[in-house]
């Protein structure tokens, strides 16, 4: 990377929670999550619940003179349960994660949602083929954004394997849709102050009014495309 591409003003993204929970607290969170899920009528068994807390750190030093460090914590809770009996049984799960434990969704609410999801799957029937409006569950919507980021990643574009390789500037979402990538969001679960090559990253629009506006480039893919890296190594 050129010196002017490197991150020099590394922001504090408030990603370390000093309040580390004791093991007994995590056990109680998992128990509360499972109890809430099993309280839903129709739930017949549990595949288990879990609660976790972790601390990780990243230090990057490169021959180009870059040196940077950041750390993060993560607290999570989740449960998997089974609804129904005999040949009519369905399983579902739910979970929540946050950088700060204080921001984590209530364990009981996570459990209730998992139980309700499992019960809602009972008696499902196949639909006939048709064209109808679709409302995506938030969990599915997140997956769609994952497919988008993979399709506009530099390596996929340079190899020509992306279904969006010829879509720069074209409308690929409905008008009015704007999708933002913000690596500097305080307490963001995927926030980071620089990328894996020490390049400065920043908030940018991926989709504006339904139109694709950028690729997600590291140094190698940027060179191959004769473009500037976007700090997505």
Give the location of each predicted region.
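Active-site bordering "gate/hinge" segments
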Residues: 1-202, 208-211
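C-terminal, non-catalytic macromolecule-binding modules
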Residues: 211-233
């Amino acid at each position: 990377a050129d010196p002017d591409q490197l991150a020099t003003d590394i922001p504090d993204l408030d990603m370390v929670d000093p309040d580390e929970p004791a093991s007994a607290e995590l056990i109680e969170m998992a128990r509360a999550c499972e109890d809430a899920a099993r309280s839903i009528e129709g739930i017949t068994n549990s595949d288990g619940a879990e609660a976790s807390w972790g601390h990780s750190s990243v230090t990057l030093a490169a021959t180009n003179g870059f040196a940077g460090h950041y750390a993060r914590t993560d607290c999570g809770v989740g449960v998997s349960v089974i609804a129904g009996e005999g040949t009519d049984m369905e399983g579902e799960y739910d979970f929540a994660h946050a950088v700060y434990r204080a921001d984590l969704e209530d364990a009981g609410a996570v459990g209730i949602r998992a139980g309700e999801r499992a019960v809602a799957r009972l008696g499902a029937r196949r639909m006939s083929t048709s064209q109808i409006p679709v409302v995506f569950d938030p969990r599915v919507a997140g997956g769609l954004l994952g497919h988008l980021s993979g399709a506009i990643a530099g390596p996929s574009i340079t190899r020509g394997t992306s279904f969006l390789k010829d879509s720069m500037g074209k409308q690929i979402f409905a008008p009015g849709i704007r999708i933002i990538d913000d690596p500097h969001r305080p307490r963001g679960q995927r926030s980071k102050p620089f990328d894996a090559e020490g390049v400065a990253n920043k908030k940018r629009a991926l989709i504006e009014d339904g139109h694709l506006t950028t690729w997600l480039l590291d140094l190698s893919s940027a060179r191959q495309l004769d473009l500037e890296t976007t700090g997505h190594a």
